């Protein structure tokens, strides 16, 4: 039986192995994609085009450059922070705060699982 206690839920997420953390990387699909594929969400992978829906970068659209399962975040083109020394670094975003507008379907396995 799984506990309802928030501390144990947090601990389970924190200590989850990477193959389980992959399931936490889901994001909503745009209306057009949702109708086309008959599903509301999909896991975010590098190459997908996403639109930021929450936060300081709301409305920004760009390609996903990197996915970090360890941190549970993604890096998106155009979402950058400038450090004090002037260098630009990608600003990590949680996948729950983005909407997928274009899917990367080069992987046949992913394409078949989404088209089901």
Curated annotation (Swiss-Prot):
GO terms for molecular function: rRNA binding; structural constituent of ribosome. The keyword Ribonucleoprotein applies. One of its GO terms (cellular component) is large ribosomal subunit. Keywords: Ribonucleoprotein, Ribosomal protein, RNA-binding, rRNA-binding. InterPro entries: KOW, Rib_uL2_dom2, Ribosomal_uL24_CS, Ribosomal_uL24_euk/arc, Ribosomal_uL24_KOW, Translation_prot_SH3-like_sf. It comes from the Archaea. GO terms for biological process: translation. One of two assembly initiator proteins, it binds directly to the 5'-end of the 23S rRNA, where it nucleates assembly of the 50S subunit. Located at the polypeptide exit tunnel on the outside of the subunit. HAMAP family: Ribosomal_uL24_A (MF_01326_A). Belongs to the universal ribosomal protein uL24 family. Part of the 50S ribosomal subunit. This is Large ribosomal subunit protein uL24.
């Amino acid at each position: 039986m799984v506990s309802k206690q928030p501390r144990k839920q947090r601990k389970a997420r924190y200590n989850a192995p990477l193959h389980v953390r992959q399931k936490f990387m889901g994001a909503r699909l745009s209306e057009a994609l949702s109708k086309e594929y008959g599903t509301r969400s999909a896991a975010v992978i590098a190459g997908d085009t996403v639109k930021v829906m929450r936060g300081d970068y709301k409305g920004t659209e760009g390609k996903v450059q990197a996915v970090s399962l360890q941190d549970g975040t993604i890096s998106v083109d155009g979402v950058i922070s400038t450090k004090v020394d002037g260098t630009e670094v990608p600003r990590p975003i949680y996948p729950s705060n983005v909407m997928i507008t274009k899917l990367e379907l080069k992987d046949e396995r992913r394409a078949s699982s989404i088209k089901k």
